[in-house]
Design a protein with these regions (language model features):
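Extended, compositionally biased low-complexity polar/Lys-Gly-rich tracts
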Residues: 30-35, 110, 114
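C-terminal helical cap(s) of enzyme catalytic domains, especially alpha/beta-barrels
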Residues: 68-79, 90-124
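Conserved anion-binding
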Residues: 1-33
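A C-terminal functional module that forms or caps the active site or interfaces directly
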Residues: 32, 36-83, 87-91
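Conserved active-site and cofactor/substrate-binding residues in soluble primary-metabolism enzymes
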Residues: 5, 9, 40, 61-64, ...
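Surface-exposed amphipathic alpha-helices with a cationic face
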Residues: 15-25, 44-49, 114, 118
Length: 124
């Protein structure tokens, strides 16, 4: 309403619903799915809603980086999860293999993604 952005209005609603669903680790059992393409929006959401758990979709997109995803995590490296299913399941296509070693290529893709994320997110 008014000058509010849609994702902020949605996060306000989720936050109201989540207040009584906070688990022992300090995060709610419900949270928003967020696109990490706009790192500054994630930074704003994280600072305003420290108890929401964020699910970051679209890590596979070209304009998304581990650095942008880092904005959704708290100072301990907690509070968010990154989805990269397409990047992982189609890793063998990028490697230009015959597809028989798909499990190995998927594992290598996971390792690359993990290295990228841990380079931008400090996990304590």
């Amino acid at each position: 309403t008014g000058g509010r952005l849609v994702h902020m209005a949605a996060a306000d609603k989720i936050n109201r619903l989540a207040q009584e669903l906070v688990g022992r680790w300090g995060y709610s059992r419900i949270g928003p799915v967020a696109a990490p393409g706009a790192g500054e929006s994630l930074r704003t959401l994280r600072s305003k809603y420290p108890q929401l758990f964020f699910l970051l979709d679209s890590y596979d997109y070209n304009n998304v980086s581990a650095k942008k995803c880092a904005a959704a995590f708290d100072k301990y490296g907690h509070g968010a999860a990154v989805l990269a299913g397409t990047k992982i399941s189609q890793a063998w296509l990028a490697a230009q293999t015959d597809g028989y070693d798909y499990a190995e290529q998927a594992a290598l893709a996971v390792e690359r993604i993990q290295r990228n994320l841990t380079g931008s997110v400090t996990i304590l």
